[in-house]
């Protein structure tokens, strides 16, 4: 079994989604079982939200993987070696921000990331007011740019906005 005990300490929900998808993708590639940790405010210093936001019905185990060898992602991009020769009985760590870790199980990941009804229903109710019209939602990151000095890198404040023709205009 491979695990990712540090989910919830290395980034917020978006990072956690990549991390879970990667550990599941690596496990499925090699035929291993995998685990993600339970919600534990004593050890998770960040905002661990996977189990609160999503159904996560396809998770093999929700538990810690104690007494296993650590396996660290070596780069901030796809680590092909880790993907291809990851041994069993390891506890992976990293950000895993590439779909290459899980593209072979995309349908499973999409099912895992079905929103729980307490998040989904208010959103659907909100959308009803638009009567089926196309709607665009925009998320603006506001917190991370303020952490520049702590993280050691600069943010690019460039926003590219373009419009594409509506299918109705064709």
Language-model segments: residues:
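N-terminal cationic-hydrophobic initiation segments that often serve targeting/anchoring roles
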Residues: 27-28, 127-128, 164
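Secretory-pathway luminal glycosyltransferase catalytic domains
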Residues: 39-161
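Conserved small/polar residues in nucleotide/adenosyl-binding loops
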Residues: 162-169
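Generic detector of well-ordered secondary structure
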Residues: 21, 25, 61, 71-72, ...
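N-terminal pre-catalytic "stem/leader" segment of glycosyltransferase-like enzymes
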Residues: 1-39
């Amino acid at each position: 079994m491979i695990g990712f005990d540090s989910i919830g300490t290395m980034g917020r929900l978006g990072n956690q989604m990549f991390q879970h998808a990667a550990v599941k993708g690596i496990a499925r590639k090699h035929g291993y079982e995998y685990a993600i940790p339970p919600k534990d405010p004593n050890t998770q210093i960040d905002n661990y939200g996977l189990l609160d936001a999503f159904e996560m019905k396809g998770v093999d185990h929700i538990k810690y993987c104690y007494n296993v060898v650590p396996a660290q992602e070596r780069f901030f991009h796809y680590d092909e070696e880790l993907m291809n020769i990851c041994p069993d009985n390891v506890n992976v760590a990293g950000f895993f921000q590439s779909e290459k870790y899980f593209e072979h199980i995309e349908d499973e990941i999409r099912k895992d990331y079905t929103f729980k009804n307490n998040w989904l229903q208010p959103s659907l109710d909100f959308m009803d007011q638009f009567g089926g019209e196309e709607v665009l939602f925009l998320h603006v990151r506001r917190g991370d740019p303020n952490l520049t000095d702590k993280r050691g890198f600069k943010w690019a404040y460039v926003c590219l906005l373009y419009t594409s023709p509506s299918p109705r205009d064709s």
